[in-house]
Amino acid sequence: MTRKLITIVVCLLLLTGCQTAKKQPSKRSMYYWSTTFKLSTSQQHFLKTQHISRLYVRFFDVVTEPDGTLMPNATISFASPFPEKVELIPTIFITNDCMKQPGNTDLAEKILRRTLQMCETHDLPHPKEIQIDCDWTLSTRKRYYAFLAQLQQLARAKNICLSTTIRLHQLTQPAPPADKGVLMVYNTGDITRFDEAKPILNADSVASYLSRRKPAYDLQLSAAYPIFSWRVLFRGTRYVGIMHSDDELPVIAGDTIVTRQPTIDEILRAKDIVERWKASANNEVILFDLSSNNITKHNKSAYEKIFSH
């Protein structure tokens, strides 16, 4: 009888442990993608009420000059203090053209040094992690991976973790040399097509990508989902460009401006698909991005759904 009782207690403890594990909340994070760090009242409120614990802040881009030189561009300035109790992850965007340039063996050292100098200059906390964002391709993979391996070694010497973005199409390649990755679950379609209603996020496209990829991807992943929209100008059915402001592009009679924006339901569908493919990817949910327009489109419960669904 005692043995049976012990067995029952052990089973109950195991069951409780499994249920507890399933209920662990996801880490909540946001991207901040602007040239000026200045938090509005609505942004501060969003960070607080949505319990955001990490901010991936774009520090600068690395671009190619006409002579092939790699240069920093669009460096962020800080007009607001960084929020307390929120972890800062400096993020650097590198254009794929940079990876086409031979040489530049000191790029990793330059990026790390500049990032740490910016943190010191703006009285920001020493980062525990930095992230590199690059839309690398098969032709630039070898050079990009060599750069990451060098940066990872330099970062580890300063107790800094290295993460890198992973686009869906990049899952076909071996995992890059980094400590972790962020799977970008967006930009699944062609923005230039008039008949493409869901170019930012189509859950069916996500399912198609992931159904052909083994979940045993050799890198710890987080998942990033889109809450942004695009206003796209078409002349007939011909793509003209994205309207970042009303007067950015000339609009003539007969033109059409369409808004492409993922619905909350589409985001939740995509999140479910990622969950079935690799559940641990949703242990950290990141939204792109923390612009005031993006965080005021829906009511509070809609964003809560994305984080807690």
Spans of features found by a protein language model:
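C-terminal motif of bacterial Sec signal peptides marking the signal peptidase cleavage site
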Residues: T16-G17
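Conserved, mostly hydrophobic/aromatic
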Residues: L55, I132, G181, A223, ...
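A structural motif corresponding to the C-terminal end of an alpha-helix
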Residues: F82-K85, M118-P125, L154-A155, S208-L221, ...
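Substrate-binding surface in catalytic domains of secreted glycosidases
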Residues: A146-R235
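Substrate-binding cleft of secreted/luminal carbohydrate-active enzymes
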Residues: F228, G236-H309
